[in-house]
Amino acid sequence: MKQIIFFIISIFSFLIPCGIAYLSGNEVVLNAVLLAFFIHWIAFIPAYIFQTEKFYDLTGSITYLTVVWFAFVSSYQSIFNNIGNLILALLISFWTIRLGSFLFMRIQKDGEDKRFRTIKPSASQFFMTWTISGTWVTLLSLIHISEPTRRY
């Protein structure tokens, strides 16, 4: 029964950001959201096989950077039209690299994140956790990834 609940949570965690992106009517936003989940789900495979969460936060940071720059590059017109978005992307990148490197170094130093001890053995629960991380990245980045893709 728990596996079904984890699966349902995973589905909704995926569909909600995809639905928001779809309703934006912008293909770049939808592709950025799909890219975020693709990265997380690919990273889940070795994490589950090797039963490790050591790259969980790092994957979130890499995904955040990828999504922000994907949206910026995909909507690039000229540096003069996008200077504000470029500055915002650079500031987001700085914050992401700072936080991601801190979390990655902490997990390397500690050896594990104790919260994952009971989660890792369950494929459905561990997958749900990776999917929710994809949701976190997409929902937090939606405000930025939708801005540079607007057409005035």
Q: How would you name each of these model-derived features?
A:
Residues 15, 37-45, 66-69, 138-139:
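Generic alpha-helical transmembrane segments of integral inner-membrane proteins
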Residues 143-152:
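Single conserved hydrophobic/aromatic residue that forms the stacking wall/gate
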Residues 7-8, 29-37, 87-90, 127-131:
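Hydrophobic alpha-helical transmembrane segments
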